[in-house]
Amino acid sequence: MTTRYTQTGLWIEEKDGVVRVGLSEKGQDDVGEVMFVELPKFGEKLRIGDNLLSVEGAKAVSEISAPITGTVQKVHDELEDENEKLNSTDRDDNWIIELTEVSGFTSAEFSDSPWFGQKKPEEV
């Protein structure tokens, strides 16, 4: 299972036709400490560019777009009451959704670095 990253601060992992999407280290840095999150609904069909996640953090209020097309098979519902899990570095905590019927997921469009070629803030 390979982890790929988007420029908008998400990580993506595919296993057995199911794609899990979560908030990467870069996404966490962009938003700051998460205080509120609005998640997609189970069964929702997302297209590339659709709103995947609305998140309010210490640094920004952001609408994060879906990086791939697919159907929401599972939502990490715990995030609604425990949104601080999005601040975790543990992927078992900071995942957002799982998608099936996925298209638009070609690894060439994504990076193998969470910072997508940028330097980490402490390296600047």
Task: Name these PLM-found stretches.
Residues 40-41, 51, 58-61:
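Short glycine/proline-centered loop/turn elements that form peptide/ligand docking sites
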Residues 68:
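A cytosolic small-molecule/anion-sensing beta-strand core signal
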Residues 12-14, 55-58, 75-78, 102:
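Residue-level recognition of beta-strand microenvironments
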Residues 1-48, 84, 88-103, 107-124:
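Acidic, low-complexity mobile loops and tails
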Residues 9-11, 64, 72:
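Conserved hydrophobic positions within beta-strands
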Residues 23-27, 50, 59, 76-79:
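Short, well-ordered turn and helix-capping elements at secondary-structure junctions
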Residues 56-65, 82-85:
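Short, Lys/Arg- and Gly-enriched loop/turn segments at beta-strand edges
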